From Swiss-Prot:
AMP binds at T31, R36, L57, L58, V59, G85, Y86, P87, R88, Q92, R160, R171. Monomer. It comes from Thermoanaerobacter pseudethanolicus (strain ATCC 33223 / 39E) (Clostridium thermohydrosulfuricum). Residues 30-59 are annotated as: NMP. GO terms for biological process: AMP salvage. This is Adenylate kinase. Belongs to the adenylate kinase family. One of its GO terms (molecular function) is adenylate kinase activity. It holds the Pfam family ADK_lid. Catalyzes the reversible transfer of the terminal phosphate group between ATP and AMP. Plays an important role in cellular energy homeostasis and in adenine nucleotide metabolism. InterPro entries: Adenyl_kin_sub, Adenylat/UMP-CMP_kin, Adenylat_kinase_CS, Adenylate_kinase_lid-dom, P-loop_NTPase. Residues 126-163 are annotated as: LID. Zn(2+) binds at C130, C133, C150, C153. GO terms for cellular component: cytoplasm.
Length: 217
């Protein structure tokens, strides 16, 4: 099973990615993770990416593409993979298509988790994190026993700068501008399946399993 997972910040992609990878026994390939791995291992591609990142520049598509393609060449991807965070634009999608075509591999499904904008904002701005032990909370769905105090270590909880309203609105705008053309691209290729992410985690996962089961037939 070869799958791409799309969805805005706050859609629960990370949670679903772990479940999909386990259910279908395929590696979860997060571009953030493989970038960090290349930086840690000080690979040539990692060094190249770091040059751009140190200057505050976006890493060019050709570098990102190569980092992802190197990961897809590994043995654990022979029977499938789940791509999370890539492609981010149509140019990357076209390069991925070319790469897979050259390998004689086809993409089974592109899952697009959709969540109402208001719900996304509530999910993200409600997050609270313990700066001491890393525990995470949500002021509505999983609050601490005492307001703003970590249950585990007693430290004051914080709201990450990325989770503040202004930052969330900007992140959603960037995602929408980048992803709308991608959604159109995969719709034309008849590989896109929209998933209602407003449901519970388990309900969303059941819908994903059904979609992937139908595609795998």
């Amino acid at each position: 099973m070869r799958v791409i997972l799309l969805g805005p910040p706050g859609a629960g992609k990370g949670t679903q990615a772990v479940k999909i990878a386990k259910e279908f026994d395929i590696p979860h390939i997060s571009t953030g993770d493989i970038f960090r791995q290349n930086l840690r291992d000080n690979t040539d591609l990692g060094k190249l990416a770091k040059e751009y990142m140190d200057k505050g520049l976006l890493v060019p598509d050709e570098v990102t593409n190569k980092i992802v393609e190197d990961r897809l060449e590994k043995d654990d991807c022979q029977k499938g993979f789940l791509l999370d965070g890539y492609p981010r634009n149509v140019a990357q999608a076209e390069e991925l298509d070319r790469f897979l075509h050259d390998k004689g591999i086809h993409l089974d499904c592109v899952l697009n988790i959709e969540v109402d904008r208001e719900a996304l904002i509530e999910r993200i701005t409600g997050r609270r994190v313990c700066p001491n032990c890393g525990a995470t909370y949500h002021i509505k769905t999983s609050p601490p026993a005492v307001d703003n105090v970590c249950d585990k270590c007693g430290a004051q909880l914080i709201q990450r700068s990325d989770d503040k309203l202004e930052s969330v609105v900007k992140r959603l705008e960037v995602y929408e501008s980048q992803t709308k053309p991608l959604i159109e691209y995969y719709t034309k290729k008849n590989t896109l399946v929209n998933i209602d992410g407003n449901k519970s985690v388990e309900e969303v996962f059941e819908d994903i399993k059904k979609a992937l089961g139908d595609r795998g037939k």
